[in-house]
């Protein structure tokens, strides 16, 4: 098992840091990209500096809809398809990933709701454009084994009334539409990637909202 961090808020001078996350996961010849970072070129540039070959990637797992985990997805797919032999075929998301979001407090402070935008989930609008690259979105309602010994958790049942948004006078707050009702956005689609090894499971999280 090899896990290489390609986007985070840490950098060593040669790599680029950002408010975002992405990791390449290599397991028994299978390559999975877990999240895609915030900016279009971060993952590509860091992979080059680290001598990481992204042409092996066939599957992407997105932990949740937030911009710092997937804004770089479409340009990344386009670049890999144009410049490498990569054939990204599937994107795995959990149920709730494409649910509408709306701002209810300080909408201008949430980056994807700027300029009066009422829909804060930009992945809804990008879904068809990404699919036009020949990539299939697979929406999971429960845990699934996507490769031998590689699992995604799917949506995680919540047992406690969590607050998954900042609090304070300047903080933003979103609601999510589920079954026709608007409720506080608890990020229902937040999921993990789990790798089973002889020494126990390896668990990768995005923000760990669930």
Question: What do these predicted ranges mean?
Answer:
Residues 84, 88-140:
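Hydrophobic alpha-helical segments and helix pairs
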Residues 105-124, 142-197:
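Active-site-proximal loop/helix segment associated with metal-binding centers of metalloenzymes
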Residues 41-93:
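Active-site metal-binding motif and surrounding structural segment of the metallo-beta-lactamase
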Residues 2-50, 186, 190-209:
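Conserved beta-strand hairpin/beta-sheet module of binuclear metal-dependent hydrolase folds
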